[in-house]
Design a protein with these regions (language model features):
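Helix-start/capping segments and mature chain N-termini
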Residues: 1-67, 73-78, 95, 99-277
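Phosphate/pyrophosphate-binding loops at sites that engage ATP/ADP/AMP, CoA/4′-phosphopantetheine
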Residues: 79-84
Length: 277
């Protein structure tokens, strides 16, 4: 994934190879930073306001200084022209800064990873792993912080087992979420996805698919569903801003069928993004 542009608080556009975080920034020392990653379509960020809302909420949960939305928007505006009216990935970061302050904002524009479309074509595989975020709220469930070591360790564990992705389940076997995705599956004309009450991330793409599903002919059920319900589904998929709708074709070695919902929702998502750009 190639970095296209970088902008930092107090510096504006900088060479992406330059250092922009102080060595004593608590984002580096303690992981005290919040971030958002979103898709850029035709040079325009998709649902930027929703991502800024979540960035603000995450920063508050972590105890960071309040996000200065205008400053973050200005930083985003500096890097977006480098997309050349094409598609890209935009990451927004709000750090605690050094102990005496001030906080720092970053905007990083990158190419969309090349592996995503081939993966969508073949379908992704996953393994289930134990997750405990809902049971221990001090682990900041639903917060997008840069303390992503657990998620990355889970992804590495999944890959060591020959899978692309990990799906977290709790101690009672209830499906939670993927390492960087929300999880969905279909029974007939009903789509199921774990409830936000379980402490999962309130995905912006998840919310968008809930809006789009009725027009595609599906009802959505949010709740606490057992892993066996997912394994018995007619089809399954994940959602995220950068990966969009990604079909799941195997979980824990059990094959899942390809179905129409993931394709319909992916098409509807792209059409909405095009209309918004």
């Amino acid at each position: 994934m190639s970095v296209l542009a970088l902008a930092a608080s107090g510096r504006g556009l900088v060479d992406p190879a330059e250092a922009v975080i102080r060595a004593d920034d608590e984002a580096l020392l303690r992981g005290r930073a919040a971030f958002e990653t979103l898709r850029v379509y035709g040079g325009r960020p998709f649902r930027l306001e929703a991502h800024l809302d979540r960035l603000t909420a995450s920063a508050e949960s972590i105890g960071l200084p309040p996000v200065e939305r205008l400053r973050v928007q200005v930083l985003a505006g500096l890097v977006l022209p480098k997309a050349n009216r094409g598609d890209a990935s935009l990451r927004l970061v709000w750090t605690a800064g050094p102990p005496e302050g001030p906080p720092s904002g970053l905007a990083l524009l990158s190419e969309v990873p090349e592996w995503i479309e081939p993966a969508r074509e073949r379908g992704a595989t996953a393994v289930s792993l134990l997750g405990v975020r809902a049971a221990v709220p001090w682990l900041l469930p639903g917060v997008k912080s840069t303390s992503y070591a657990v998620n990355m360790a889970a992804e590495a564990e999944a890959k060591s087992r020959g899978a692309d992705e990990a799906v977290f389940v709790d101690g009672d076997g209830i499906v939670l979420e993927g390492t960087v995705t929300n999880v969905w599956w279909r029974h007939g004309d009903t789509l199921r996805t774990p409830s936000l009450d379980l402490g999962i991330l309130a995905g912006v793409t998840r919310a968008t698919l809930i809006e789009l599903a009725p027009a595609c002919g599906y009802t959505v059920e949010e709740g606490a569903f057992a892993l066996r319900d997912l394994l018995e589904a007619e089809e399954a998929f994940t959602s995220s801003s950068v990966r969009e709708v990604m079909p799941l074709v195997e979980i824990d070695g059990r094959a899942l069928g390809r179905g129409p919902a993931s394709e319909q929702l992916q098409k509807a998502l792209r059409e909405l993004a095009a209309a918004s750009s």
